[in-house]
A protein has these predicted regions:
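Phosphate-group recognition and catalysis centered on beta-loop-alpha active-site segments
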Residues: 1-128
Length: 128
């Protein structure tokens, strides 16, 4: 079987690793999604690729510098296009609830050490 991976979602058409990019990937016919996971300061697992948020949001620093609640106040879409102003960072559990039940293949890169068990627990919980 051929897998058409949407790298960080449909990142050519919407801000990478956002719900807009993941939804667009499905609309364009992707049957696989690649995404990256990191841990916030308060231990939440979010989807984000870069080491720093500087180029993909309206703030500066690392994901681990902020709580998930703080990150929700940031704009992760305007860097790509004003059409996506206000785009939010994605909690992995929210992604999993929406997409794991679909007939897709996933490539998940863990950017932080020690998040393997939590990631697997979310997958088990949302894929039951």
């Amino acid at each position: 079987m051929f897998i058409n991976y949407a790298h960080r979602g449909a990142s050519e058409y919407a801000p990478e690793n956002t719900m807009s990019a993941f939804n667009m990937a499905l609309q364009l016919g992707a049957n696989g999604i690649e995404l990256d996971l990191q841990r916030t300061r308060d231990g939440k697992i979010v989807i984000f690729h870069d080491n720093k948020i500087d180029n993909k949001s309206n703030k500066k620093g690392k994901i681990s510098d902020y709580t998930y609640q703080e990150l929700l106040d940031f704009d992760f879409g305007s860097w790509f296009s004003l059409k996506y102003k206000g785009e939010k960072i994605v909690l992995f559990e929210d992604f999993a609830k929406k997409f794991l039940s679909k007939s897709l293949t996933f490539a998940i890169e863990l950017k932080d050490e020690g998040i393997e068990k939590e990631t697997f627990d979310v997958i088990k919980k949302c894929n039951a």
